[in-house]
């Protein structure tokens, strides 16, 4: 199984004073030798947080994805991309994980799955090794003008966490 000393964990996103300390503590508990990179926004209060490397990013803001007369819907995809990418630049370990700052580990069992089911076809390989995530699902969040005409986004990768070789996540 993969040793925690070979893992960089990029904790990305806004700091929640209640959940983020729990998130960091859970990483120390279940991945005790992992490198923790906290990647958040400039001007954020990061006092009393346990991390190894700090990355303070300029907040790119949200993206408007739908607008109706009574409601606007925004997406944080640019924030996730910036904070994850900048955190990965500081990662020094063979494996990397992108983790939202409000998630809490309850085990390290995800590591058991990284090298399971290694058979794969060569025609469709994008990465050196597979990337683990918690779920792939379908979203209906692309603006097309009318709510009834929303476009399906199949195989949308969850923003909760990703794990793989650092070179693949880069």
Label each region the model flagged.
Residues 5-7, 28-38, 52-53:
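Short loop->beta transition adjacent to catalytic acidic/histidine clusters or analogous donor-positioning motifs
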Residues 7, 38, 42, 77-85, ...:
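Catalytic phosphate/metal-binding cores of nucleic-acid and nucleotide-processing enzymes, i.e., regions
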Residues 7-16:
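A conserved hydrophobic helix/loop-capping motif in glycosyltransferases and polysaccharide synthases
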Residues 16-30:
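Short, well-formed alpha-helical segments that are part of the catalytic scaffolds
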Residues 39-90:
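Active-site-proximal specificity loops/subdomain of glycosyltransferases
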Residues 76, 106-170:
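Conserved catalytic core of nucleotide-sugar-dependent glycosyltransferases
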Residues 96:
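Short aromatic/hydrophobic "clamp" motif used to bind/position activated sugar donors
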Residues 99-100:
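Active-site acidic Asp-centered loop
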